[in-house]
Amino acid sequence: MTFLAIDVGNTRLKWALFDAAQPGAGLLAHGAEFLDHIERLAEGPWSHLPAPRHMLGCVVAGDAVKRRVAEQMELWDVPARWVVPSAQEAGVINGYDHPTRLGADRWVAMIGARHRLLAQGPARPLIVVMVGTAVTVEALDAEGRFLGGLILPGHGIMLRALESGTAGLHVPTGEVRLFPSNTSDALTSGGTYAIAGAVERMYQHLRQHCGQEPACMMTGGAGWKMAPSMTRPFELVENLIFDGLLEIAARRFAELPA
């Protein structure tokens, strides 16, 4: 039973075809397209794929993108199904004031991270960091309850904001330094340490709240940039959203008639 997982972010659509809708399924194919190029999927990379039995995705870019993806999926006559955050799913409890207003990507990544943690050993508090166009830092207790999270700009947004709002500053490529001694390095280091500082602060909050050292998982296209600057042990995971979609799909599609 092949399964298509789709993660639509702020700038790109990422997809992966698995040989089953369950955790640990084998990866058959994967790819990514910028949102402006979604219409290429059916006649391009998807044209050579076997028809998936089911599809499940998460999207932060709005209903218009959902419609565009659904049009591409007419290639297979497979309905497009999307995750909507709820009060509880796959063993994770949603502590947001209004659960359905939580970003679907955040919700799915937390589910993926929680089950990845449980597969490694006993339950413990967990910090989940996604580093992309925006950065999110989530806190879950040992029972799988989402307590709350932070949202802050990613590297690119920070640098563009400084460029547009500050006279004479342009956005060159710099390095992360302990003591930056030029503008390029100062900009890059400032953004990196801002993100690392947010993670550290949430780590301290969660440790104090739970009385236990949290685990930390990081994902997202720019996660590798943060690795050398992190002060706590962490696991860098290629795509927690796909992990979460597999967990959710295993439960949802098992309930559907064959």
Curated annotation (Swiss-Prot):
Cell compartment(s), UniProt: Cytoplasm
Cofactor note: A monovalent cation. Ammonium or potassium.
Pfam families per the UniProt record, alphabetical: Pan_kinase
Pathway per the UniProt entry: Cofactor biosynthesis; coenzyme A biosynthesis; CoA from (R)-pantothenate: step 1/5
Co-factor requirement: NH4(+); K(+)
Enzyme Commission number(s) from the entry: 2.7.1.33
Assembly and interaction partners: Homodimer.
Family membership: Belongs to the type III pantothenate kinase family.
Protein name: Type III pantothenate kinase
